[in-house]
C-alpha cells in the first residue's frame, strides 16, 4: 500500500480557501461509525450521522479532498451518464423513477448543504449539454421530450441559432440543452466546506492515515499504521482507492481517469464574452 501523498498541483488546490491540518490518527479509539475516505461521500455521511447522534471517526489516507472529490470538473448535473431510457430498460419503470428522483435529491442536497453551512465554493446555477453533430441535436430533442413526458422535468430549454450564440460565443455547437436546475462549483472548496461542517458537528477527522486492514467480528476493527479504531458500523468511501481493504468491493471497482485543463485567467469581461450567463458547458461526445 502506498504512503500518504499531498494534494497534486492543480487550479483547485492553488485556489483553495484553506490548507488542511487535521492530525494523523494514532492509538486506540472506539466509535459508532468509522468512515474511510475524506471526499464528498465520506464527509457527507459523517456529517449526517453525527447530526443524528452517532459518534463518528473519519480516516483519510492522504488529505481531505485529495481524490476525485477535490479535482473533478465541478459540474453538478441531473441524471446519470446515459439516458434514462437505457436505465429504464435495465431496471424497469418504477426503479428508474426512483433513480431519477435520487439524482434530483442529490442536487437539492448540495444546494442545501451549501446554504446551511455557508460553504464558499462559487456555486453557480446553469449547465448546458452541447451538440456538435446533427445526430446529437436530435438526441437532445428526444432527451428533453423524454424527461418532460416521463419524469415531469420542466427545467430544460433547447437553444439553437442566434439564441444559442447569444449564450456562448462559438460556432462549434449546433444546439444546446440548458438546465437551470443544474450548476457548477469549486469542488475542493465544497469538500473543505463539508469537512468544516462535519468537524463543527463533532466528527473526528484524521488525515495522512492509511488503513492497512479491516477485521470483521462482533465489532469491526480498522487497522492503521499507528493504531486501530473499533466500530459498530463501517463506511467505505474511498472510491477507486480501496485497494487491499475490501476484496469483495475491489473486484467490482474499475478506476476511470478524466483530464481537466485550465487556461490562464481570462478576466471577468473576456469570460462573460465567451459564456454570457456563466453556465457550465459540456458537449455530448463519448469519451
PLM feature segments, named:
Residues 138, 146, 172-232:
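Helical element adjacent to the flavin cofactor pocket in flavoenzyme catalytic cores
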Residues 51-71:
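Glycine-rich FAD pyrophosphate-binding loop
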Residues 2-15, 82-88, 112-126, 131-193:
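Flavin (FAD/FMN) cofactor-binding and adjacent substrate-gating region
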Residues 94, 98-112, 142:
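A non-catalytic, amphipathic alpha-helix used as a structural packing/dimerization or gating element
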Residues 29-58:
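N-terminal Rossmann-like FAD-binding beta1-loop-alpha1 element of flavoenzymes
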Residues 72-101:
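Glycine-rich active-site loop/strand segments that organize a redox cofactor
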Residues 1-33, 51:
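Extreme N-terminal leader/targeting segments of oxidoreductases
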Residues 213-287:
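Flavin-dependent oxidoreductases
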